[in-house]
Structure formats: C-alpha cells, structure tokens
C-alpha cells in the first residue's frame, strides 16, 4: 500500500509586508572567483526507514521472512530518499538540518518548544491549540478543491487574525499531546529557539502543513539571519514549527505559486492570494545569482554525494545535448493561469536492449511531475502493465509489486521520450532486489495525473529548473566526474536547445494507447541535434535509430541527501 502524502496550508493572516532578502558573502566565500554569480550547496545521500535511523550505507533492499503459516513475507526497507542541508539560524547561530524539496516552496524549521521532543515531554499537560473556523464563507479549501499534486490531497485555510495574531475563526479548541508521543530525539537534527535569537522577528502569520503518513508541522512565520554553505541570508521568510511530529524541517525550492500563501485558500478569506520571496528568489534579488534557476545532479545510485547549483549549469555533469522543454500547466482547469509545480510532458516510453532491440510501448502524451522528494517512479497502470509484460514480471497482490527474475546485467533500459530526445534509465534503476527475488520499483497509478518521476528516474538525468521561463532542460547524467565546467545562467540556459517537439505537449487527459515509435524521427520533423543522432523516417516497426547521448556533461552542486524508504506492503 502506497503511503500518500497529504499537505495542507493554514494561514492566519497575510504577511504585513514583503521583505526583500539579502545575501551577505561569508568570510569563506569561495576559493575560486568570488564574483561568480552562482551558489553551490553540498548534500550527502542517506537511506533509512525513518529520519531517526538514516545512514549512507543503508541502501534499499528486499528481505524474505518465513512466516509461521509457511508463507514467505517480503519486507522492503530503506526506500525513501530526501536531501538535507545544514543551516545556522539566528543570532547567535543555532544549528538545524532541513530537507531540500523541489516539490514545495516554503522553508520551515522545528522550534525548540516542540512538545513531541522527548526533552520537552510534559505528558497530557502539554497541549496544542487547534484553530476552529466556520467554512461556510470560504467554500472549502482551494488546495482540497484543486488537488494540485494529483496524488496529493489536503485542506487549507487562511484564518483572520485575532487579538493574539494566532487564533481565528469561530474559536479554538485544545488537544493534548500524550507522553507516549513525546519520543522524538529533536537534538539529532537541531531545533530553533526564537527567544534565543536577538534577530528573529515574527510577523504573526500562522503556518501549518500535514502529511499523509500522519506527520505535520504548525507554527508561525518570521524572519531571521540564515547561514548556509558560504552564504549569509537575511530577510528570508520562514516558519518556526513549535509543534511537529516530523524530526526534520523542509527547505522548499519550488515555484512561488506553490507557496502556502498562494495555493492555500488565502483568496477565499482575504480576497487575494499572494506570493512572497522564497529562497531561490531571495538569492536572485540579492545579486547572489543572476537568474531564478538551479541544476540538480544526483549522481549514480551508489554515490554518496550529489550537487545542486543555483544560478548556473555545469556542463561536466551530463553527456550529449541539453534539451529544453516547457513546464506544463496541469491545473489550468482549476483556475491557475500558470504552472505551480514541475510537470513536464512524456511523449513516449519504450524499452531498449543495448540498442539492438527496441520496442515502443506508447506515444500517448503523459504529464509527469519531476519530484526529488519521491524515491520511486509512478506511471499509469496501463504503462506499468506494458513494462511488466515485456519483462515477464507477474503482479503479486499479496506484496503489491510486480515480481520478476533478477536481471543479469544492465543491458535493458527503459527509455523516456521528452519532445524528441531521450533519457535512458537502466532497468536496475527500478529494481528492488533480495539477490534472488526482484521487484519492479515502478508503482502503478490510476490515471496520468499521478505520474511522478522520482529519484529512481532523476538519478539518470541532469536537470536544470528554470523558474523564470517555466522550462526544464535535461540531458543524460554523467556519473562520478570530479571536473567542473560551470557557466552562469543569465537569461536562458547556456548551450541548451529547444527539443524538436518542444510544442508537442500534454493538454488534456487521454487513454493510454499502445504502439507508435519513439526510436525514429519523422523526416518531416527532423530537427538539428548535436551529438551522434541518426534520424530516419518513422515506421510502424520500432527499428532502431537510437539517440546517442554524446559526450557532454553537467556538474552540479553538493547537498546532503537523505533517503528514507517506506514499506509498501
């Protein structure tokens, strides 16, 4: 059973004003050109079943257990992956660690008075305030109504300020926090004391976010000084969660339209939704970077490090040509005039066996969310069934996965077509193995709105996120290179070219149709490709004119990647 994430945003008042964040170079700016307009954040890859037991050596694995009734039970461990960065917040600085997430846009950190911390346990005498409100005037939550994530659902509301600035609506109620729940070791990733910082300023805007696994965070927005990597950031709005059962906060670097002040129900309560300057925008407005862009490089699945690079692209970390495709708006029918998340169009999916045997499964256009906060890959049920059939995999209702013979080598690849260029992912990227038993780590979804390209896909791609032009540039990732060839992004991504099918994007949902051909290029639509691409006229059979990814690479920047995996049984 898939654990679905549920996120909701609750805002008690609008920010009083927009604060322009500033970046002050730290003393140890950079060893290279101090005038370079890019920012590198380092990350590690870590794995585990929870944030409390993560480690760099805990790779995803499948274990077989013999039950008393004679049946074998499959236990899947270490399945979830995240990225984390270390921050110093406040004056004097307090150390906290947060997860980096391209699928959200707000920064929140854990408060030191969190009652779920074992050090703060006061049993049932420690109570939390739950805002109660009359929804009759709001028409419900905008987030709930639009279901912006497809596979995510939730509720949100903006609550008018009271005398305290935190309550609202028709009153408040209290709920106790049992001592049995106050068990978190909050010192592991750090907490933040607002009273311990002379520079913290609250703006009395209430924040709340919740997740489908039962975790949540609530608190108040404010501003303070942040130090991360070689930067000192001032004026960045973030939330301090004085109540959360999640052991780590989140640094959201997504589109500003995904901020809780915009995609929550602020419009229903105040008459307008608004966006504030989140972390990537603050970097640009302060002059630290020239464009609101960043490049993500996960390296291969066995690597312990990866990088994210704000405001630049590293040509040493990818091979072939960097192709650009538009971000598509999957929520236009819900009233959004522009995209709020990183959805792109998959124009086709196929399977290749070392290029000697290629088969196209479908050329139906599918919208897919690029999400570094999701470990596995989720595709429409019909497509997963096609892949399973080609691999000879059988679905096990008891396990909830397709079971297949473990591949003997990496010759088999799943090929994703994006507007006429390919990202090839070896089958091993999607395999969960015990050594003798293998599971297909591609999860079927009920329709195309739930398609997610998670880390198992993103490991194979170098991805540049252009938040200003609403475009994504991708190329095949090059692994374990120590060289750098960094180029600043000013307006458009350097060396990137529009994909030949740039305008051939998803617009409406459609049934998945089998067949087609992604391994040849129609002669009437031949585009100029750099690299060693052979073109030919499309035919009914998938004769190979496979795109060669060439020999260019893009370097990215370091962050701390944390992998957690939930058992889907």
UniProtKB/Swiss-Prot annotation:
Keywords: Aspartyl protease, Autocatalytic cleavage, Cell membrane, Cleavage on pair of basic residues, Disulfide bond, Glycoprotein, GPI-anchor, Hydrolase, Lipoprotein, Membrane, Protease, Signal, Zymogen
Glycosylation sites per record: 95, 203, 232, 242, 245, 299, 358, 480, 522, 532
One term under GO cellular component: fungal-type cell wall
EC number, UniProt record: 3.4.23.41
pH influence on activity: Optimum pH is 4.0.
Membrane topology: Lipid-anchor; GPI-anchor
UniProt family annotation: Belongs to the peptidase A1 family.
Protein name: Aspartic proteinase 3
């Amino acid at each position: 059973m898939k654990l679905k994430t549920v996120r909701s945003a609750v805002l008690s008042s609008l920010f009083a004003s927009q604060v322009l964040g500033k970046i002050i170079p730290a003393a140890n700016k950079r060893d290279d050109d101090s005038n370079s307009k890019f920012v590198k954040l380092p990350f590690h890859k870590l794995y585990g079943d929870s944030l409390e037991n993560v480690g760099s050596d805990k790779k995803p694995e499948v274990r077989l257990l013999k039950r008393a009734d004679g049946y074998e039970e499959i236990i899947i461990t270490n399945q979830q992956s995240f990225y984390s960065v270390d921050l110093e917040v406040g004056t004097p600085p307090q150390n906290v660690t947060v997860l980096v997430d391209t699928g959200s846009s707000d920064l929140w950190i854990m408060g030191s008075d969190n009652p779920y911390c074992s050090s703060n346990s006061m049993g049932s005498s420690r109570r939390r305030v739950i805002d109660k409100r009359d929804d009759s005037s709001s028409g419900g939550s905008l987030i709930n109504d639009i279901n912006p994530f497809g596979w995510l659902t939730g509720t949100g509301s903006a609550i008018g300020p009271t005398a305290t600035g935190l309550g609202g609506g028709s009153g408040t109620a209290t709920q106790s926090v049992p001592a049995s729940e106050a068990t978190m070791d909050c010192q592991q990733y750090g907490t933040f004391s607002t009273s311990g910082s002379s520079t913290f300023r609250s703006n009395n805007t209430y924040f709340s976010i919740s997740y489908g696994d039962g975790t949540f965070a609530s608190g108040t927005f404010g501003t303070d000084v942040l130090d991360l990597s070689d930067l000192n950031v001032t004026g960045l709005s973030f939330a301090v969660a004085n109540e959360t059962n999640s052991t780590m906060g989140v640094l959201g670097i997504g589109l500003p339209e995904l901020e809780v002040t915009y995609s929550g129900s602020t419009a229903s309560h105040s008459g307008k939704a608004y966006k504030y300057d989140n972390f990537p925008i603050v970097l640009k407005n302060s002059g630290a970077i020239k464009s609101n862009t960043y490049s993500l490089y996960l390296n291969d699945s066995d690597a312990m490090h990866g990088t994210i690079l704000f405001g630049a692209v590293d040509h040493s970390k990818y091979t072939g040509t960097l192709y650009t495709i538009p971000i598509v708006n999957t929520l236009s029918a819900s009233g959004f005039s522009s995209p709020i998340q990183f959805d792109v169009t998959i124009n086709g999916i196929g399977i290749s066996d070392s290029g000697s045997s290629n088969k196209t499964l479908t050329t139906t256009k599918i919208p897919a969310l690029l999400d570094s906060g999701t470990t596995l890959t989720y595709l429409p049920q019909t497509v997963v069934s096609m892949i399973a059939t080609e691999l000879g995999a059988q679905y096990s209702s008891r396990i909830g996965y397709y079971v297949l013979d473990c591949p003997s080598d990496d010759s088999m690849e799943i090929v994703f077509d994006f507007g006429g260029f390919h990202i090839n992912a070896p089958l091993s990227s999607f395999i969960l193995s015990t050594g003798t038993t293998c599971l297909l780590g591609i999860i079927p979804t009920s329709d195309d709105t739930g398609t997610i390209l998670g880390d198992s896909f993103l490991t194979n791609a170098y991805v540049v996120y252009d938040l200003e032009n609403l475009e994504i540039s991708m190329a095949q990732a090059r692994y374990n290179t120590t060289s750098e060839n960094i180029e600043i992004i000013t307006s458009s991504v350097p060396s990137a070219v529009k994909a030949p099918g740039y305008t051939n994007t998803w617009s409406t949902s459609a049934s998945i149709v089998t067949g087609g051909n992604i391994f040849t290029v129609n002669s009437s639509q031949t585009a100029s490709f750099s690299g060693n691409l052979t073109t030919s006229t499309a035919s009914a059979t998938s004769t190979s004119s496979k795109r060669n990814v060439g020999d260019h690479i893009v370097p990215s920047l370091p962050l701390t990647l944390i992998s957690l995996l939930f058992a889907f049984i």
